[in-house]
Amino acid sequence: MSAAKELGGAGLRGQSAGSTALCTVGKTGTGLTYRGYDITDLAHHAQFEEVAHLLLVGHLPTQAELDQYKTRLIGLRSLPEKLKQALELIPAEAHPMDVMRTGCSILGNLEPEHTFAEQQAATERMLALFPAIICYWYRFSHDGVRIDTADQSEDSIGGYFLKMLTGQAPSELFRKVMHCSLTLYAEHEFNASTFAARVCASTLSDIHSCVTGAIGTLRGPLHGGANEAAMAMIEQWHSADEAEAGIMRMLANKEKIMGFGHAIYRESDPRNALIKEWSKALSEAVGDSHLYAVSERVEAVMKREKDLFCNADFFHASAYHFMGIPTKLFTPIFVMSRLTGWAAHVYEQRANNRIIRPSADYVGPEHQTWLPIEQRG
């Protein structure tokens, strides 16, 4: 028997765990592509639904294909009554990621994927319903309102989410920001949640189980939630100078500052500059100059003191805040977007599958002598 290849490095950093045609991350120290398309081009020019089609169907849609795709998604927004009933039982103090995990799992019970031929239809249903799941729970548990999730007045997923959350039609600026944000978060190669989805898929499990496992993985603070932590940090400061003093204290105390650095990117996160542009535009549109100034100062101090760059999460915090999105819902938006990447990886794993079963290096005790229970201790 040949020896298994030893994989060094904590968390398998720097190790290849498989092949993918979906995404490249940090190939030049800064780059990000989806199926060969640069993230900057997609973020500047594409609607999120075009990106979803690219990842899930395999190509950028024609206008006719995009219209059909969006029409299909709009028609899938109505929450099943039994799912509504379940969401109404979840208390307001529940973690929103638990709501997403539970909602996905219940959907898998109500509308199971019977064969892999149904994977595209099952994914489209989740893509249409995930904004409805989080907003229905939030509005009912916090406001006592039962929203009509079958609303068809917004043709984009981002616009629909904002309409369900606030009850008001979003501005065109807000719609554009959501297209960009959802595009930036859509896919990122073998991150922890995506790899969890692929491991689950490799057992030939159903797609709802794969996505539920991915949501549970993203719930962990070392993977998801960085934009929420960044928001909690920056909103405590009322000026750029106060922010600089605060960051210097945190650095002196060796506290972790969320939203900076990345496991793969060496020079910069290309998503940061893209969402930062929108954060600035939003700050001007809503007349909130101080939070953006605080964010910029924190970015400058971290670069000066630690030579660390912002990742995608940092300026997302202020961008979401400017649009009136509660901080606790930041990570569920990530789920609404990353579903496209998770599902595309599930499809890819299924198409060329072998169960993922790595080896481990045993570090426990060697041979032990059995003792009857009365002789132990």
Predicted segment positions?
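Non-transmembrane, aqueous-exposed alpha-helical and coiled segments at domain scale
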Residues: 1-377
